Every structure is written in C-alpha cells, then in structure tokens.
Amino acid sequence: MKVRIDKSVFTDAKDGNKQLELAFLLHIILYKNRYELKIEDGEVLGTDSFGKLMQSDRDTIEQIIAMDIVASSNSYDCVVKTGGDAEEVQKVFSAEEAILYLLQPYSVILENGLNDAHFMNAVFRLFDPTGILSHYQTEGWIRYENAGGCSNVKNFLQARIQQFGGKQKFLRCYVLLDGDKRYPTDTAPDVKYKTLKAQLGIWNVGYHVLEKRCMENYMPDEAIRAVAGTTYKDWADAYMTLSAEQKDFLDISEGFETDITREEKKTVRAKESLLMTKDKHRRKKSYVRGYLPQDEQNFYMSVSNGNFLHLEKGLKIKNFKVKFPETFGNSVVTYRANLLSRTSHQSDPLELSTIAQSILAAV
C-alpha cells in the first residue's frame, strides 16, 4: 500500500509531541517494508522536523524523493496531511489518525474465521507468487475475522466504523462470501446479497462472492479421497461420479437434505421409517430427491439412484467443520495444479488467483 505524507505534516511538527508523532508514523510505514512511503515535495528536506529524524529515516526519505523526481506518480492508497481529520470517507488522514489506521491489521472477513482460514492460507501460499500475503499473515499484518455468517457482515463493519468515530475511511478489509447457490441458476443468494453488496460499495470495501457454493467445494478430488478414507469410500466413490459443475454446488457435509424444508424432512423421515419397518433388507430409495427444487432435480438428473443415496445425507465425518478444512493445508493432496483443476471450468478459471491479487493490491 502506498502512503503519501504531505509536506504539511513536516512543517507542523514543531513541538516534541508532534515530532514523536511524525517519527512513529515513519516507523510504522518503514518497519520491515510493510508499506511503501511516498514523499513528493523536496522542500521537506529543509524543515526542522526532518533534521531531527534519525539518520536512517533521513536517508530513506532523501532516496524516496530522488526516485519520485524520476518516476512521479499521483496514485496513493493513503494520504497523510494536516487537516486530514476533517475527511470521513476518502483515505485522507491526519498524522494521529494515520497511526491508528496503519497499525490495524488488514482484515479478511470470512463467514467462519477459524475454519475458513485453512482455505485462505492455501490461496495465499499457492496463488501469490510474491509470497507477500503469507509473510504478512505470519507477521500479523493480515488477520482473518469471523463475521458470524453473511447476514452479520454489515453489522460487523458498522461496529468497526463506530470504533473510529463513525468514519468509514478507517475500514481496512476485504469480504469473502460463500456463493451459497444450490445449483447454477439458483437466484436466492443474489437477492440475499443485493443490499450487502450495495453497502460494501458505499463503504469502498472490496469483496468477492465465491463461484462455488462454499469453500469446501474447492477441495481437490485427491484431498476428498484422503479425507473420506476407507470408512467413507462409498460416499467418495459416488462423489467422483459427479461432473465438475455438480461438485461445485453439493453441500458436502449435509448432502441434499439441507436443501429441503424442515417439514419436508419430517415427511422423509416418516417414509423412511415406514419402509424400514416393512422390510429392513429392501433397497432403500431416495425420498429426498422428489422434494428438491425442480431446477436442482434437473441439475442432478444424471446421478444414479444408488449414488444419490450415498450423497443424500452428506459426508458424516466427526467434527467435519474443523477436520475437513484442515486438508487445505496438506500439501501432499492439496496443491496449485489440482486446485486449478477445480476452477478450470468456471466463468473465472483463475478465481483463486483473482482473490489473492485483490488482497495483495490492498495491503
């Protein structure tokens, strides 16, 4: 992130506190090259405050000014200037505000900050060739935040804004939302996200809605096999018969039952119980399939009855939400090539790289 310090910050640093403020601001920006410092006005070199800085800081500023004379750019992510505290929307700050803003970790807001972190770590590790994102995450400069589901993202960000006196300019974050579609033509999530996406636009917050149902749907086939093992081999065998697109929208943990209503589930349970009472050895048929939305039934029409039965109730691994995502961190079964194979058919076949580059551009 490019941070420009205006000449006014140097000229106004006349007392001891302001001088310390300037020195601390420079330290935050320059420490371990976290941010890219920009100072265009060579006149700062003649200010009293510049002369009181550490020699290493003075040398750095002189080099920056010399380089900017050769290759000047007016594109900045953050501007620090006297009177910047009057701004509430644009990324313009006073020196005191800039310290608060730049000390914040960059927040990647997830629907489940703990479990989804494994997916994001894989994206950073495998789709950022610079290594910056993984480095920033290790340093604590990128933080995963738990929004508590998509319905709470707006409240989460509103609370963050209030922490900074109601100024939205203090938001430093990127929101990643599950696609939540049950099948490709499912419009319910689009309606659900419409208001949130509009508000994120107003707040100038970057976001991405996954093309697949959720992060679990990006798991490569090799990783699925490893997780299922021999215990859930029948489920895995059935899963492998699905097309790439069908895998995108399956609820892996809950199966198809999550796509019918509570009352429909009760009816299904009653029918299943009656069948088992009549003949425990009779081959069971799916009662769930007929209750799915017609578009979803059509989408999975190619799935045989036997395979549908295996997939119907999901992959019932104990502590699924904890254990399953951990496989994104297993480099033996989860790597760049097989993650790319899971997105090659999408509208954006490089979706994971798109996510990584969007965050990289902001930090």
Which residues make up each language-model segment?
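N-terminal extension/subdomain marker
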Residues: 1-88
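RecA-like P-loop NTPase motor core
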Residues: 65-181
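Glycine- and acidic-residue-rich phosphate-binding/metal-coordinating active-site segment common to enzymes
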Residues: 132-242
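Intrinsically disordered, low-complexity basic segments at termini and long loops, enriched
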Residues: 40, 54, 343, 351-352
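C-terminal structured domain segments
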Residues: 41-43, 47, 270-346
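Activity-critical C-terminal alpha-helical subdomain
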Residues: 191-310
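Short, charged N-terminal helix-start/capping segments
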Residues: 26-43, 86-106, 352, 361-363
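Conserved small-residue
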Residues: 1-10, 346-358, 362
